[in-house]
Amino acid sequence: DLSALPTPQGNRGANIADMAAYNEKINPFKNGITPEAEAAWENRYLDFFKLFLKHKDKITRVTLWGVSDAGSWKNNFPVRGRTDYPLFFDRQYNPKKIVQLVIDEASK
């Protein structure tokens, strides 16, 4: 699962104060992803697709778990209200920059 968000780790426990800090830590982009985080996410995805293309003789398909960020199963997981940006199309179904980057890489 590729995500722009940090991966939750550790025991969250039952302390409400700890949970609030934890929720903020793993949901940093609830009002929109920063350009820096989006660029890092794009680079990570592109690195994976370069690897897939390098081994295209062994890989027959790549599955993405959804189309648009609006309907991603990663929203609200692992905590309610979490906003993720894991897919190739934004919440309005507009293609992200990664779509063209992958097309360009595959066309080489």
Identify the residue ranges that each predicted region occupies.
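Aromatic-rich peripheral "rim/lid" segments of glycoside hydrolase catalytic domains that contact
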Residues: 2-108
